[in-house]
Amino acid sequence: MENYPQFLLFFILASVVGIVSIAVALSWVLHYREGLGWDGGAAEFNWHPLLMVIGFIFLQGIAIVVYRLPWTWRCSKQMMKLIHAGLHILAFILAVISVVAVFVFHNAKNIPNMYSLHSWVGLAAVVLYPSQIVLGIAVYLIPVTPVRVRAALMPLHIYSGLFIFISVIAAALMGITEKLIFSLKSPAYKDSPPEAVLVNVLGLLIAAFGALVVWIATRSAWKRPREETAQTLSNNTTSPEEIKVGTDMTTTS
């Protein structure tokens, strides 16, 4: 891999920022909000931001870049496809649970649904995401699609995946801001109480994680090498810094 130390730095940063984001989201709902529950009350709503950060942001981000981890190149391409799809499916399951929690809470409290830009963008991402997963499995995981078709569709697959991921980041930033505006009364959001500061930090962490994932996913020098090259790596002890595969990258990794 070219610039392996740089890749490792960005991946470690992304992982740390993502994990810290989850910790901050958990701290927010446990310390400043009503905790977690499943009774139609505010504690049920709190699953929404927490599971969105864990699933729709962190797990989706890791799923996007998992192909590019050099230590996975010793695994078969089919195995990595299964891991890639599995992470996306798990992220989607958590996202669905979080959306259900919101609707149950809103209906229990007679709060209108689907009126804000946050809800529109967020639901659009939730609807598009399974379509991306199903098409990805049909085209790339099930070995029946011609290689030429897979190669032709790969740019669209990559673009739509990143578009959905960025849309989720945008929806999350709108959502946590909306929650603070509605919830903080005395002191108000504009007075910057500790909860507001904490959640603003969460927003910055989410944005930073998204930026790091997109950067890692769009560096052509960090793509997974061709299958035959990856198999060669599994049979030698060449360090990632010494592996030069810039000219051997496929367009379908």
UniProtKB/Swiss-Prot annotation:
Biased segments, Polar residues type: 230-240
Membrane-traversing stretches: 6-30, 46-67, 77-103, 117-142, 150-177, 196-220
Residue ranges, Cytoplasmic side: 1-5, 68-76, 143-149, 221-253
Residues annotated to bind Fe(3+): 106
Keywords on record: Cell membrane, Electron transport, Heme, Iron, Membrane, Metal-binding, Oxidoreductase, Translocase, Transmembrane, Transmembrane helix, Transport
Cytochrome b561 domain location: 13-218
Leader sequence segment: none
Compartments, record wording: Cell membrane; Apical cell membrane
Record: residues binding L-ascorbate: 77, 81, 150
Protein's name in the database: Plasma membrane ascorbate-dependent reductase CYBRD1
Organism for this UniProt entry: Danio rerio (Zebrafish)
